[in-house]
Amino acid sequence: MGVSMRIQSIVACAAAAPLLLAATPLPVRLQPSSPWVVDYAENTCRLIRTFGEGKTVVKLAFESDAPGSMDMLALGKPLQTSDERVSARFLPVGGKPFDGNVAATVPKGDPAILWSNVAMLPDELLAKFKKAQDEQKLHPDDRPPSITLTPSESPRALRQQFATAATELEIDARRSQPVILETGSLGEAIAAFDKCSDDSLTDWGVDPQLEAKIVRPVWALNPSHWLSRADYPRDMLWKGSESEVNVRLLIDASGKVTKCTSLSHYEAPEFNRISCEKITKRARFEPAELADGTKVPSYYIQRVVFRIAPF
């Protein structure tokens, strides 16, 4: 009898397994509820679209303060999470997910997630870039040689290919039930977004046609000396405030900083002020160069992260 009962129990468990699998929650899929909007803001370009209706609304925004630099922000109640970091990836092209930081929006307090430096490139190309960066770190004082790429080999062209193939954005705010924004192909929207970034160059005093001919970008000589722990604003430290600041520097043909603009998604302007003040004073550069060695004005982007280390 004991053996018979044991076999019956195993069979019963096996029969219940499909029911448990079927109960696994499906992803929350949200369709667009607005068109893509490109916002030519004063110092940035934004690409914005809303998904879902009512309590399921999620707003997605891409933001760029310079060509080739892009952050991504998503906010809305469906993104509620207890995690401090949330991963996302573009489907069906994305492989390895990329992580973002969770924050709370003001004044509604809706969940918000910020992903910094979103590349929108294939994993193998990102790995290649990382390898080059790691090798450069071994020789931080050596300026990389000039690079000449065909139009189809440029990161811009490869990003456009990636964006065209991407049709969804998966956000793992709840690991057992991700939110999927059904974006459709991102190719046309990203192309319009990049045009805004190109148009912004003229507003900064940078010639877009000249910028496209640069084979050696601006080179920073001493970035490790720009900011230190001592530069953390004391009032912000006492308040426990943190921030991430994107610093955009205009560099003339002699390597001199002619303008500094600091931008942040955080509402703590003291971090912005400190970043520009210290970097403008301490930074040293070699200017951008054309193929014939002519030095030309260009720009340089630096991200400054203000974090309080845990005790």
Residue ranges and their predicted role:
Residues 1-9:
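Positively charged n-region of N-terminal signal peptides that target proteins for export
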Residues 9-24:
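Hydrophobic h-region of N-terminal signal peptides that target proteins for export
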Residues 24-89:
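An ectodomain-focused feature that recognizes extracytoplasmic/extracellular
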Residues 77-120:
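Predominantly extracellular/secreted and cell-surface proteins with exposed
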Residues 105-227:
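Internal interaction segment
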Residues 210-248, 273-311:
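Short proline/glycine- and basic residue-enriched helix-capping loop/turn segments at helix->loop/beta transitions
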Residues 234-235, 264-270:
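A short acidic/small-residue loop/turn micro-motif
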Residues 252, 257, 290:
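Short, acidic, Ser/Thr-enriched surface-loop or helix-capping motifs
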